[in-house]
Amino acid sequence: MKEILNALYHQKDLNDGEVKKLFTLIINEKVSPAQLGAVLCALKIKGESFKEISVAATTLLEHAPKPFDSGLDLIDNCGTGGDGLKTINISTIAALIASSMGLSMAKHGSRSVSSHSGSADLLENLGVNIEMNPTQLENCFKQTHFGFLFAPLYHQSFKKSAPLRKELFTKTIFNCLGPLINPLRPKIQLLGVYEKSLCKTMALALKALGVKRAMVVNGGGTDEIVLHDTTHACELKNNGILEYDLSAKDFDLPPYDLKELQIKNAQESVQACLDILENKGKDSHTMVVVANVASLLYLSHKAKDLKEGVGMTLEHLKTKVPYTHLQKIIRLSHA
């Protein structure tokens, strides 16, 4: 541990062996609170490399139980969170809609730290059992194409280090790791990050982890694809990374103000979700979710481009199938 800290104090990147050793110690609770705080702050000040992030994620995955084997190329749209803008839960609503369209969504998530409603909070408030056992999870997934994996159930180091991380008053490597350590190891990811500068780093980390297809995005300071501002994207495709910007025009959708996405409490988040699924949501809410579903369809090769994905999603919402689909998920999650 002394050597690892010394390297970080001198602003040196850790090699693969050092990262693996460090996170194995963290998992096994062999690192004191003072040492963990020092490591996280030193990594933050130095700047985490994509190799450090990917090796840390690999180490955490090696210690996480895999609930079942689907045999499919699963999709996740978990983001880092941490943008602090208190918007509706775009990614979770998008995952529910995408799964109702047949996409195999393995949603990894946790409770909110900086928003009114994280993925776990929203699903729980909707009535979903967020702590499904492996049998329940597999059954729900097979019948609905949707499964929610509550991060603290699979990664105890996240749960146990949470109080210390909160006391640091800054984002750490743990924020980056959350979307990379889904125990079902999805091969397709739409990953939102809280800072534009992280897009390329996280795309490289996904590539190193063996993800086949991905888009890492930061839209106007949020960890989502948005319509109120430019969305910066790094797309992992054919083992290469394409970097570009997206605007509302790329989706053939009108722009909306960020303020229209912001909510005051968890109940507003629940109502926004239900309204969108019943095709009676505010246009500003519905359209930003549609843009994110369209991106999932594009990444999954179900739509040839983003505009086609938008059209497919809008037509699907008219059927109100997403709402009945949610009721099925709720029922099966408790079965």
From Swiss-Prot:
Record's catalysed reaction(s): N-(5-phospho-beta-D-ribosyl)anthranilate + diphosphate = 5-phospho-alpha-D-ribose 1-diphosphate + anthranilate
Membrane-spanning ranges: none
Pfam (any one): Glycos_trans_3N
Enzyme class: transferase
Residues that, per the record, bind anthranilate 1: 79
Residues that bind anthranilate 2: 165
An annotated GO cellular component: cytosol
Domain of life according to the entry: Bacteria
Free-text cofactor note: Binds 2 magnesium ions per monomer.
EC number(s) per entry: 2.4.2.18
A single GO molecular function term of this UniProt record: anthranilate phosphoribosyltransferase activity
GO BP annotation list: L-tryptophan biosynthetic process
Binding site for 5-phospho-alpha-D-ribose 1-diphosphate: 79, 82-83, 87, 89-92, 107-115, 119
Residues engaged in binding Mg(2+) 2: 223-224
Cofactor: Mg(2+)
Zinc as UniProt keyword: no
Amino-acid positions noted as binding Mg(2+) 1 in the UniProt annotation, renumbered to this chain: 91, 224
Stated family: Belongs to the anthranilate phosphoribosyltransferase family.
The protein's role, per its UniProt record: Catalyzes the transfer of the phosphoribosyl group of 5-phosphorylribose-1-pyrophosphate (PRPP) to anthranilate to yield N-(5'-phosphoribosyl)-anthranilate (PRA).
Assembly, per entry: Homodimer.
Identification of the protein by name: Anthranilate phosphoribosyltransferase
